Amino acid sequence: MILDFNFKLIHQIFDLNCLPESAEVIFLGWPDLVVSEQLMIELYGDLAEQFRVENNPVPWARKDGELFDVHTVFQHHNCNLTIIDVIKHRGVEEFLDLNEPLLEHFYKRFDLVVDTGTLEHCFNVGTAFKNMCDMVKVGGVVVTSAPYSRPYHGYYNFVQETYTDGFGTNGFEILDLICTKSKKMRVVLAEEFFTKIMPGQGILNCIAKKVEDKKFTWPIQRKYSK
């Protein structure tokens, strides 16, 4: 699911104009775009109404926000979408189990890889992270979010070093790394924040660009590698 804070991160990529024309984009899991009408109007003006899903196929009444058509929105940005999952929710997904080694035709294929909350549900999370990195071309971007302090949400909670070490060891430059607690909260990462303040229901969000083609290696946590 893509919520306001996820879509703001994704939209940073559009604003930076770092995607080629006809960009290849992959979503890890079905991306229901459930965002506020206010945000869509802010980003798209009168076009926002064209993106709305009138007959909502999923009961998202428990979520704040409206459902917008992710295909129409990304087509507006000249993106070709691939959606992978282990369940065919809509019938258009390609089956891919991120717990397993990546299939050859997914390697270095995508300009943008979007994970808005899938990796923490993969039991073999290290392999899933590796697969995410291996999917993106050099010059491409990963946008990923995972729980920082949400017990019982998935199998795992992440820490900032998951991204600084995982991406930093494997040829990526981190463009943004933040913690969100709600749609209205944006906290820049700092040692004091993470050592002294534990945000309830905190979510880590990272944008990383692949700047070098490197064979993936398992990182060693930096505080132990010195």
Predicted segments with their positions:
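Conserved Class I S-adenosyl-L-methionine
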Residues: 153-180
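Class I SAM-dependent methyltransferase Rossmann-like catalytic core
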Residues: 1-23, 32-42
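Conserved SAM-binding loop
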Residues: 24-28, 65-152
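Core SAM-dependent methyltransferase catalytic element
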Residues: 186-226
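Short amphipathic alpha-helical segments and helix-helix/interface helices
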Residues: 10, 14-16, 70-74, 129, ...
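A short catalytic or substrate-binding loop motif that flags glycine-/basic-rich loops and adjacent residues
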Residues: 1, 75, 198-201
